[in-house]
């Protein structure tokens, strides 16, 4: 339902599609960036540094439904990346129509969403392990692939899954969802 809603017309320029949103939310969960409560929502609808809600979700019921779908998606992703073994499989943007637009290539939208989340905080890589730095560098590389990448969807998905797995193993919190749950 969320994927279809994000694919509809009427969103502001710069809003996220479902693959970009997944990458964005995974970054918030696997690499918590210390974003103030709720401040992570506006980038989803294309908000540029403010809380101006687009007409598409301006009605209170529509906004509540949108927020609930996004938070529900985030909870689903958290369950997938927290499971042992991990059940996370990256969603690649296969529904996009191929064009000259680089964001239509597999994994690029996802990786760009991940990087968009990281840009919300200036913590950088300074206190991260070498493995985490390498994982983020791999994701950044996918966001910048040339227009004709020599990699398959399966290779991109495997690389994203591996990078996320590395980051999840080191996370201290679940970002907007709070402290990690202790399971005995």
What residue ranges belong to the model's regions?
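Domain-length accessory/inserted modules outside core catalytic folds
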Residues: 1-111, 115-184
């Amino acid at each position: 339902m969320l994927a279809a809603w994000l694919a509809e017309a009427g969103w502001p320029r710069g809003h996220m599609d479902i693959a970009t949103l997944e990458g964005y939310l995974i970054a918030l969960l696997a690499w918590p960036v210390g974003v103030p409560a709720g401040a992570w929502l506006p980038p989803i609808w294309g908000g540029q540094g403010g809380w101006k809600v687009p007409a598409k979700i301006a009605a209170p019921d529509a906004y509540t439904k949108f927020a609930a779908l996004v938070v529900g998606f985030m909870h689903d992703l958290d369950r997938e990346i927290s499971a042992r073994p991990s059940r996370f499989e990256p969603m690649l943007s296969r529904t996009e129509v191929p064009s000259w637009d680089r964001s239509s290539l597999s994994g690029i939208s996802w990786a760009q969403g991940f990087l968009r989340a990281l840009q919300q905080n200036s913590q950088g890589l300074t206190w991260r392990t070498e493995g985490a730095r390498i994982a983020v560098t791999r994701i950044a590389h996918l966001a910048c692939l040339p227009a004709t990448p020599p990699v398959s969807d399966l290779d991109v998905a495997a690389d994203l899954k591996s990078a996320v797995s590395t980051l999840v193993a080191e996370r201290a919190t679940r970002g907007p969802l709070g402290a990690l749950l202790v399971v005995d």
